[in-house]
Amino acid sequence: MSKHVAVLMGGWSSEREISLRSGNACAEALEGEGYRVTRVNVGPDIATVLTELRPDAALNALHGPAGEDGTIQGLLEILKIPYTHSGVLASALAMHKERAKTVMRAAGVSVPEGRVVNRHDAAKSHPLTPPYVVKPIAEGSSMGVIIVRDERSHPPQILASDEWVYGEEVLAETYVAGRELTCAVLGDRALGVTEIKPVSGEWYDFDAKYAGGGSIHVLPADLKLNIYQRVQELALTAHQALGCRGVSRADLRYDDTPGGTGALVVLEVNTQPGMTQTSLVPEIAAHAGQSFGELVRWMVEDASLNR
């Protein structure tokens, strides 16, 4: 009898629609691989749903708070349902950008300088010397990210308004100029490096990530061999330092601008990267010779407890 897999998707975070795309793509691929699949649109009754469903494994296609911060992982541990991706601790650590940086820095991974500040204080005066970036402590998909270019710019006033829905504390980081890179990690190996070039704008914001034609993916990234290998080393080290399991994706910046610093830094590790057939991790896996179906099958067969 084929293995029964519950594909968890949706949820109630700001990344719900992205999660639905990932989940449906994974479910379709798993069905093509011969698994018995139940699509689960996650809501507040998820504990009851999973208790009644009793799948052999859960493929976690959730994004954002409650889906990749250790919450759903803890529930799956309680229910004794093997699941994909990272466990409770690694998920919670990686989701909290500042604590993740502390762990990565201790492991020798270069990260941007920065500090946590109250959002109202950051709206009154510059928390760092511009250029700098302000971002929510625990959001994905570039939600709420603001770049302040120079000292003549006013601090971002939206931080003090009711429109800001990402919590009272924000992370202010030194802006690193240069190229946007990302590296997929699968288990104990780095699969490859992609350079992301936004078609409009200067950085990889939400629209560049998810709008059709919003960015160009250069795979493999056109880098000197030593830099390419260093990106892979940093991604794998960050994955291991945070205790990640299964699939993760490290996002980096490389400053090779004229007169630049040459800095190569890890911005964050995504423990629940996008999983449509055109998402970054599946693209990198395909370039490494692994089809989308083979990728999701590997993830399900890797599912376990105590991750």
Curated annotation (Swiss-Prot):
Record bears the keyword rRNA processing: no
Known pathway: Cell wall biogenesis; peptidoglycan biosynthesis
Annotated binding of ATP, by residue: 127-182
Any one GO cellular component localisation term in the record: cytoplasm
Protein residues bound to Mg(2+) 1: 251, 268
Example GO BP: peptidoglycan biosynthetic process
The name this protein goes by in its record: D-alanine--D-alanine ligase
